[in-house]
C-alpha cells in the first residue's frame, strides 16, 4: 500500500486533466518532484547526494564497504506522458530500501536508489 500511495502522490505533481502528467525536466514540476523524492529518501534514513548532472542518489549502508547495488529510473516525463512514465523504477527502488529498513535487515552490500535526469533532460526539456 505504501508504494501505491507514493506512486499516487508523485503522480499528482504535474498531473494533467486526462490522468497523465507533464513533469518535463528543468521545470517547476520537475523541481517539485525532485524535492519530494529527496524528502522521501531522507525520511527513509538514506544518505542523499545529488551529482553535477542532477541525478539523485539515496544510499543505504551495507555491512561491508563494497560498490552498491543500484536501482532506479527517472521521475521527469515527456510532455503529456503517462502517469507512471519512468517513476515506477525509482519508486520500487525506494520501496525496497524502506522495506529493508522496516524489517531491520542488515545487508552485506550497500543499496542505492537513483533518480536519473540525464537522458530525459536532453529529450524533454523545453527548447
Residue map of PLM features:
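Acidic/His- and Gly-rich active-site-bordering loop/insert found
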Residues: 1-82
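Acidic/histidine-rich catalytic neighborhood of metal-dependent amide-processing enzymes
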Residues: 78, 88-127
